[in-house]
C-alpha cells in the first residue's frame, strides 16, 4: 500500500485557540487537496505550550470525547476522508495530560499521553499513565509518540515491536538542528516511517525551529519544510523493506541487566541497605573525545599514542576514542583477520604503560581475536597496568 503522508507546520499563538484552529484547518485542507491521507499536526496544536500555571492549562484543556478541537478534527477527517494526528491538552475531569489523538473518517480511533515530559509540561501535566499503543487502520498500523518521547528509544521500539509501520510525532521542538538526528535515528533503528510535525515561531522568548518532516525506514529525510507555515509531504510505502544489514539483530538476552539497574534509586539509600563497602565520594574531572580515521593498525596505534600524550599534557583524566580505532574498519572477514589483535598482544602492555605515564584512562575500540580463533568487535578500558573488557559483539 502507498499513500501520501503530511506534516503540518505553523506558528501556534499562545492561548488563542480560535486563531490556531483556523490556521490548522486551512493547512489540513491544503494537504488533503494535495492527496494526503495521513496528516500530522504539532503538539498542543491549538493552545500554545508554555503555560504559567495550572489555571492557564485548565482554561485551555479539553476532554477527548467531546472537546472543541477533537470535534473540529473529526469533522475534517470525515469530510476530507483522511486520518489526523494532533496534540492537545487533555482533561479527564480530574487530571490534565499532554496528549495526542488519532482521528479517522469514522471518528476518534485512539490517544497517546506523553510519557516523557519537557520543562513546561511539569507545571501542569500528569505523566502519561497508559501503555504504548499501536492502532490498526485501513492505511496501516500507526503509533504515536509526542516530542520528548522520541528522545528515549523505548517508546518507539515498543511501537515497532507491536507492529507500527508509521510513527506519528506531534512536536514543540526547539533544537536548532532540524530535522533532528534523533528523528532519523528512531526511523532507522526501527525500520519504520516517522512523521514529525513541529511548530515554528517564538513563545515567551523560546524559539521553535520548524523543520517538520518525514523520515523513511532507512533514516532518510524524504520531505522537510524548514521554515514558516507550510506542509512537508511524501509518499508512504508500507511495502518498503529497509536494509537491516547495517544494524545487527536485537539481542535481548544481553539487556537483562536493565531490569536490575539501580540508578533510579537514591544512591545513598541503596548503598546503606546493600553495599559491602562505603559509597565513593563524587569527583570532578576533565574528559576528552577524539576523532580519527586510521587506515591500518600501525597508523591507528600511532594516532592513539599521540592522542593519549596530548590528553595527558592537557590534564584530561579520561579519553574516549572511536570504535575500531586500532586497525580501522575492515571491509571483509579477511581484512578483519589482518587487523585483529590477540588478547595477549604486547600492544596492551605498551598502551597500559603509556596511560600510566600520562595519568589518563582510555576507552577505545578494536577487533579482538580470541583463543578459539573467533573475532569480536570490542571496547577496552585501559587504566594503568589493568585492562578491562567492557563490551563485545561476536562476529563468528
Regions found by a protein language model. Name each.
Residues 1-5, 134-143, 166, 278-287:
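Beta-strand-turn-beta hairpins that frame and shape the catalytic cleft
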Residues 9-11, 42, 113, 198, ...:
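Residue-level recognition of beta-strand->loop/alpha-helix junctions
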Residues 20, 28-58, 77, 84-85, ...:
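Active-site beta-strand/loop signature of hydrolases that rely on acidic residues for catalysis
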Residues 24, 39, 270-342, 348-359, ...:
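Conserved small-residue-rich
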Residues 62, 67-85, 150-232, 340-363:
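CN hydrolase (nitrilase-like) catalytic-core segments centered on the catalytic cysteine
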Residues 62, 91-165, 170-171, 175-181, ...:
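Active-site catalytic loop in hydrolytic enzyme cores
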Residues 86-88, 99-102, 133, 196, ...:
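Short beta-strand scaffold segments in enzyme catalytic cores
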Residues 133-136, 193, 199-284, 309, ...:
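C-terminal beta-strand edge segments of enzyme domains
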